Amino acid sequence: MALYEHIFIVRPDVSPAQMESLLEETKALIEEKGGKTGKIEYWGLRNLSYRINKSRKGHYGLIDIDAEADVINELERLQRLSEDVIRHMTLRVEAHTEEPSAILTKKDDRRGRRERN
């Protein structure tokens, strides 16, 4: 099995609770097809670099996946059909890291600076 990182962006009018359930549904789909999931991160509502489908913001999610290519193909097919998902990207990686992603680390750094002042 190969290792992948799957990042997707969901419309801004979706609630954070719905985004969490979407992450859980994605995890269930991967495990149902015989894959395994590693860390799952919800990055929150973030500004987009450019407009996508008239949206300036989006909810970001990241899932580390250990699965065969057909599982990834099915996941991407379902996300293309979903009205909530406005962008998705799957990257093949050599190894998964256990530490939080750079996006979450940057958020924590900013929070720490505010507390010192």
UniProtKB/Swiss-Prot annotation:
GO terms for molecular function: small ribosomal subunit rRNA binding; structural constituent of ribosome. Residues 97-117 are annotated as: Disordered. GO terms for biological process: translation. Pfam families: Ribosomal_S6. HAMAP family: Ribosomal_bS6 (MF_00360). The lineage of its organism: Bacteria, Pseudomonadati, Pseudomonadota, Alphaproteobacteria, Maricaulales. Gene3D superfamilies: 3.30.70.60. The gene is rpsF. InterPro entries: Ribosomal_bS6, Ribosomal_bS6_CS, Ribosomal_bS6_sf, Ribosomal_S6_plastid/chlpt, Transl_elong_EF1B/ribsomal_bS6. It comes from Maricaulis maris (strain MCS10). SUPFAM superfamilies: Ribosomal protein S6. It comes from the Bacteria. One of its GO terms (cellular component) is cytosolic small ribosomal subunit. This is Small ribosomal subunit protein bS6. CDD domains: bS6. Binds together with bS18 to 16S ribosomal RNA. NCBIfam families: S6 (TIGR00166). Belongs to the bacterial ribosomal protein bS6 family. PROSITE patterns: RIBOSOMAL_S6. Keywords: Ribonucleoprotein, Ribosomal protein, RNA-binding, rRNA-binding.
